[in-house]
Amino acid sequence: FKDVLFPLGDICKPEVRKIASEYGLVTASKKDSTGICFIGERNFKQFLSNYLPNKPGIVVDIDTKNKVGEHIGLMYYTIGQRKGLNIGGNTDKMFVVGKDLNKNILYVAFGEENKYLLSYSAHISDINFLSDKKPEKCAAKFRYRQPDIDVQVEYLDDNNILVKYPQGVKAVTPGQACVLYLNDECILGGIIEEVY
């Protein structure tokens, strides 16, 4: 970060909003965004379909191994998702628990506490260290607005760590981010490669 300048780096969002309000900027009262900023207020599935071809396949209940429906393309589903599965029947408590990219199968499981939703450790790669600190115990976030998760960290090399959370965490998803904090300080971030 030697050649990067963050003009708002020392102040928090409430103060930024206050300053924006004082200058009469419309962003002062704009709702926070949790989507992908560069696609705007468009339908995410529609956006993806403009660039990637749909590849329909089957949906399988991972517990019974039975086909329970069809999907429109694995790219549209995330681990832990329960809405928008469109597989009919009593799907209020059906959750996406896995994807087989080679066979084009979407796996679902019944119940919020299903063992297939839980993992207990994750291999994190592409590490971006934001601090010289390398604690063995700290807090992690695997999703936006998720409560802090107490974790143990094993530093494998300069680019890989193993994050352990013996209490189990739902829907930790390969391809998404893991961010570690020591108290209020963000110490590193990386990409979830695999969960165990």
Model-predicted regions and their roles:
Residues 1-187, 191-196:
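Nucleotide-activated chemistry modules centered on ATP-dependent adenylation/adenylyltransferase
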